[in-house]
């Protein structure tokens, strides 16, 4: 992440934004699946992880001759990561024990043709017709692991208290 913060050439953004990126060197360290792993909801563990991320950032910022990050963020929704490793997203619980995952894909994508031929349910993007759709929405049934914590298992106050810990 510290190395990534050195990649500040954005020709489509203003010079002021480049300066801002170089000054702040924001760093995102993803801790996803928190409601699937009780240990990463432990405030003491989170504090240790935060301190380690800051320590490593400081070390590599010095090696690269750049500013240390002004903010190290350790919680992101991490939608793609959570789907890849089958865990809850970021600091959120899973939606439900069973749900439909919808994925958008180009009508010209070879993967779309293969999935369509395999019988995966697919629908044209909202506002498009089946005949001239450029984007389709695929639907995949998902079953959460047995014992997974879902949104109806955690009250609003408990969610807020957890947010305050990771904030």
Predicted stretch roles:
Residues 1-13, 23, 77, 84-167:
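Catalytic alpha/beta core of large soluble enzyme barrels
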Residues 8-18, 26, 31-77:
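Internal maturation/activation junctions in enzymes
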Residues 70, 83-84:
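Short capping micro-motif at the N-terminus of alpha-helices
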């Amino acid at each position: 992440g510290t190395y990534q913060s050195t990649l500040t050439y954005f020709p489509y953004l203003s010079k002021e934004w480049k300066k801002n990126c170089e000054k702040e060197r924001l760093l995102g360290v993803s801790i996803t699946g928190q409601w699937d792993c009780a240990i990463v909801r432990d405030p003491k563990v989170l504090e240790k992880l935060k301190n380690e991320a800051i320590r490593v950032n400081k070390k590599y910022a010095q090696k690269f001759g750049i500013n240390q990050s002004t903010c190290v963020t350790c919680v992101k929704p991490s939608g793609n990561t959570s789907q890849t490793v089958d865990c809850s997203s970021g600091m959120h619980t899973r939606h439900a024990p069973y749900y439909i995952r919808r994925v958008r894909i180009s009508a010209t994508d070879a993967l779309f043709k293969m999935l369509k031929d395999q019988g995966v349910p697919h629908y044209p993007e909202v506002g498009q017709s089946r005949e001239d759709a450029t984007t389709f929405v695929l639907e995949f049934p998902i079953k959460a692991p047995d014992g997974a914590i879902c949104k109806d298992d955690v009250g609003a106050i408990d969610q807020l208290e957890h947010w305050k810990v990771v904030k």
